[in-house]
């Protein structure tokens, strides 16, 4: 019995067409699997065939289809050869690095005379590329290294030295380092002035003034104090000159330091100069900038503070009678802002009553030797004595 009996041919025609198409696809797959692709030794390899093992053009493809595809890939990888496909766009990664992770399967053009030509740039001392026409690498400016290495497309300027040795007239050199003020050494000479704390990296040199700029005249009320200060400074200069005989023999943190002036060791300007941008106000005042090379403002090399709008004392600090006292100046006797400080720096903070007996500040130790009280001990003793006086007054009342 015929299974298709009674079934119209019009309903069977779509099914027959689908079967015919399925058989054609099977035959084409068998043809692709059998590897019946043309071998053209003089032509470039078919990139699609090398990558997938198939070719949709079949026997009409004009490229070469080698039988051992894996051998071709391994040989090209060992030789470092990359396909040259004239007419195709150039491989950007190949032009930058000279290599290509896709190898012979890459569909772009790899000209041999341009291998890594885009990556041939000069390197800085850390091995990162210098690209003057590109923007600075922000990550490199912050951390000092770059995870992209030689393939980074941004500029990596030469790093500035953080430490440098500055030779002095003696037998010793002192490394410069940026640090905050420390509590030693102190000025230990017995005089009518408070203790002076020298910052780290600062070497005393005779004849230098702590603050730059022209010194203005002082008020008549401070004439006597200034005269005492100058006499004391001259005496200390003579004493230190007789001991050192004009030579500087190394820096001892525990020894007494003359107040004839100090000179900060010079360093190279590591802050960016941006002529078209506003000036960094903090840098103009202090000569320092916490943002460093990433600061967006201008840092002129020849930094000149604006002329002060008030009178300056003999040590170059502003006298502003109506303003509050500079806390740092009253505590340490110096001011990092110099003539640009907006607070008052009177000379009277350095002096106290000269008629007071100095025996009150000298105590005897257990060994029988006398020693001088420090500033903190003197203040504590004064506080204790004032407390006792208050107690006695309350008892009498």
Curated annotation (Swiss-Prot):
Keywords, in A-Z order: DNA-binding, Metal-binding, Nucleus, Repeat, Zinc, Zinc-finger
Keyword Cytoplasm: no
Family matches, as PANTHER family: PROTEIN PHOSPHATASE RELATED, ZINC FINGER CCCH DOMAIN-CONTAINING PROTEIN 33-RELATED
Positions of C3H1-type zinc fingers: 40-68, 85-113, 131-159, 274-302, 320-348
Coiled coil (UniProt feature): none
Any one of the GO BP annotations: negative regulation of translation
InterPro entries: Plant_ZF_CCCH, Znf_CCCH, Znf_CCCH_sf
GO molecular function, one term: phytochrome binding
PROSITE patterns: ZF_C3H1
GO cellular component terms, semicolon-separated: cytosol; nucleus
Compartments (UniProt record): Nucleus
Gene: ZFN1
Gene3D superfamilies: Zinc finger, CCCH-type
Principal subcellular localization: nucleus
Organism name: Arabidopsis thaliana
Protein name, per record: Zinc finger CCCH domain-containing protein 33
Composition bias, Polar residues: 364-397
Region annotation Disordered: where it falls in the sequence: 361-397
Keyword Zinc-finger: yes
